[in-house]
């Protein structure tokens, strides 16, 4: 697959909430996004381990190489590395530790409790998550949250125990959580930022930011990559 950045690529550098965690919003990412959709349509998907509410398949190496090479400076800035200078800090190399085509296929009423609240992907501050939307219908984007009781917008190792202790104390249950995907303010969480899903838009944020997909109660799962809620989800590490 021959991929390149779109000539009209646009990068917005935003900050989330009171804690000002970084967020990149990148529109018109690749020049040939439709080829990614067709590639996904010819790929075998499977249910992964963990709590992802759908099915996944490996994204092509050419995609990973393009993103790491052409967006390196923006990614390093999102990691808090000034001007791309990594000498004395790390090797300066970026790598995808995970990069998958992803399709949300779990109906709202079938979600487990952890899938109905915002989550973090890791406790590491210096690790990124990316989501590249590859659907053209109005199927929702991604939102970021503050836990009301603790005030936490990000969860690191020092916050992990008090955060989950607080959740246990709040006695999470069906009535507390609501019947489906979180999609706005609740008694437990305040939505502090939201980005709509748009074809060929990518979000990049730190993996310890509390976040969730914006998926409505009327969401109808579709396992077809050409018509379903297809994205490329990745974890990017500085090594």
Please tell me what each predicted stretch does.
Residues 1-204, 208-239:
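Fe(II)/2-oxoglutarate oxygenase catalytic core
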